[in-house]
Structures are given as C-alpha cells and as structure tokens.
Amino acid sequence: MHIKATVERLPGGMMLVPLLLGAVCHTLWPQAGSTLGSFSNGLISGTVPILAVWFFCMGATIQLRASGRVLRRSGSLVLTKIAMAWLVAVLCAPLLPIGGVPSGPLAGLSVLALVAAMDMTNGGLYAALMQQYGSSEDAGAVVLMSLESGPLISMLILGASGLASFDPLLFVGAVLPLLLGFALGNLDAQLRQFFAQATTTLVPFFGFALGNTLDLSTIAHTGASGVLLGVAVIVITGLPLLLADRWIGGGNGTAGVAASSTAGAAVATPALIAGMAPQFAPAAPAATALVASAVIVTSLLVPLLTALYARRGVARSG
C-alpha cells in the first residue's frame, strides 16, 4: 500500500489528514484520551510537548552561515509578512469579535485566525518553488523563514497591536526550544542533520493531537470562510511581498509571490496562543479549522501564481 504517497497528494496532507482523523476521533469519542490514559492520552492530547520537540528540531536546521545577500532577501520577505499580519490585526481588531464571527460567510473569522494564517510562510513550498523558478539565493531565503515557526511571532503581533498582554517569561518559553536547537545545530553539523530528520516525522503526530481539539461541526461551520481566508492571505500579503522582493531584496518579485502562503505549522498557533492568553480560547477551535483551510488553499494557488508570474517575467525579458 502506498499510504504516504496518497496522503502527500493533498497539499499539506501529512499535517491535514492526521488532523482530520483526530477531529473524527474527538467527535465520536471526546473522552478517549482521559479514558485510555497513559501513552494513548499523550498521543491524543500531547500537542504542546510534541510541538516543543518539533520547534527544537526546526531550530537545529537554521544555519548561522549565510551570505549578506541571502539575509537581505529572506529578511525583506519575513519582515514584510510580519508587518502585514500586524497591520491586519490593528485594522480588524475593532471590527471582529475576539471570539470570532458567530455566523454567516465569515463564520469563525477572528483576529487570531488572521494573524496565525498570515504571519508564517510555508517554507517547504517556498523552497521547492524557488528551486524551480528562482536562484540558489532565492531558495536560501528559507533560512530566516524558519524563525517564524512557533507562536512567538503571533504573540509579538498580538501584543504590539494591543490585543493581548503576555508575561515576558512566556516569550522566553516560546522561543527557548528553538534557540537551543539553533545552538546545537550550529555547533555540530552532524547534530543538525540528525535533528533535521525529525522535523517531517513529527508533523503527523502534532496534526493528530491538534485534531483532537476540534469537532467536525466546527470544520463544517467554517468551510466557506476558510477558503476566503486562504485567498485573503495571498491577496493581502502577496503584493507587498512581491514589491519587497523587487525593491528591497533585489529580486524580480517571484520569491515574493512564492512566499504568500500559510505554513502547515500555523495550524497549531491558535491553540498555543489560547493556552497562554485565555481570552482567545473561544476563538481557537474555529481559528484552527480556518487556518487549516488556508493551508490547503494557499498550497494549491501559490504554485500556480508563482509559475504564471515567473513565466510572465521570462516572456518580458525575452
């Protein structure tokens, strides 16, 4: 049986299929974790410890050695993505209930969902697109994109926009596993290679644990708004990223288009934020479902838009 190959045909499948399976389990048997206990409960409810290990391993993949040009390219994209997420948070905070829109075509939409979907780029998708349509320097920009992994950037955006106040120690706790992994990965290349293997292995596990916080009715309730959110991520972040790549990064804009996606890891952000800022707890389940939809939508549309833009540039230069 070719289960892995089949799952990977769906964009973000290694995250989203286990997430859906977890949601099915939670819908049919909400008390499964507490009833089974022990290791089964850890697998069902262990989102935070599983993600802690994943953040550590992600940190180990970030290499300190990078040319100034690569840092300029990646820095311009990362800072632009974060700036747009912050701007959206500031503009939408007075318009959206903190617990999310209760019904209608925007059902479940909240500032938490917007920030989580917009502040983290799908680094794997970006690197793959740049290997095909960009240069080695473009692909190398994924170096700084790894820093977006985890809830830290979302915490900073929500704090800077006045929507939340976090204890400084929570910021330290959020970034410490990433920094420890970063330190070890740069001290020993063999350790970097060793830990890097786990970054993909752990994805279905935290996807399943996250799914066990969702109900299928929540996913169905937010279906249309999830598609709209995915399109909004591309529209709102895509043009600024394109311009930043051209004007600041020194590229032709292709890298900017390729960076206008939502990372699979962003699906975990709402639950993690809600655990640190309880006022977001009512919005977290719907936000998780919305971000999962945005991952699928952007994973489908961004490669098409990147290819169209790159070919248009080739046609013009020719």
From Swiss-Prot:
It catalyses: 2-dehydro-3-deoxy-D-gluconate(in) + H(+)(in) = 2-dehydro-3-deoxy-D-gluconate(out) + H(+)(out). The chain crosses the membrane at residues 10-30, 42-62, 82-102, 109-129, 139-159, 163-183, 194-214, 224-244, 257-277, 289-309. Keywords: Cell inner membrane, Cell membrane, Membrane, Sugar transport, Symport, Transmembrane, Transmembrane helix, Transport. It is a multi-pass membrane protein. Pfam families: KdgT. GO terms for molecular function: 2-keto-3-deoxygluconate:proton symporter activity. It is found in: Cell inner membrane. InterPro entries: 2keto-3dGluconate_permease, 2keto-3dGluconate_permease_sub. It comes from the Bacteria. The keyword Cytoplasm does not apply. GO terms for cellular component: plasma membrane. HAMAP family: KdgT. Belongs to the KdgT transporter family. NCBIfam families: kdgT. Catalyzes the proton-dependent uptake of 2-keto-3-deoxygluconate (KDG) into the cell. This is 2-keto-3-deoxygluconate permease.
